Amino acid sequence: MTLRPDITTMRNYQYASSIRWGLSAIKLPSNLGITSSELNARCFSTSIPKFSTEESTIENRGNIIYQPGVTKYAGQHTFMFYETEDSLIAKFINSYKQKTWKDLSGVQEPSRNLKADLKFSLLTSMDVEREAYNMYGAWVKDYDATELGSSNSEIIKYTVTFQYDYFLRV
């Protein structure tokens, strides 16, 4: 085994591109005013879901060792969307808000009606799914939007954070 790959070895690989991915909804709450493909078409940035494993520390008479402890899902995942003139992303966020905390009354739908199941897929260069992550029990927790101004023509962007229960690599 060589310690450093040569150019011939490197040329044999088909490297995975960071622009080949897709977002789809396995299940969306009703009456959000948006479809899975409309969300996907406006989504321009995200990351791969992650987990972390806590450590257990074992200390005995001056010796310390570590072993894997509890593994936890990050619990939150962020997607960035371009807004269109039909205000579809703003309406989606507001529809979610109305389901989780209705204006002036604080009425909330049952949580089973609020949660979505989202699928984040990584694609090959031929746009064939090569791996996917299903996020279960997702709902809109927070969002942020582009600051409006008067000196540029930047497109309005929404950063939407979803809280989720867990994800599986499928």
Write out the residue ranges for each language-model feature:
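Glycine-rich, low-complexity intrinsically disordered segments
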Residues: M1-V170
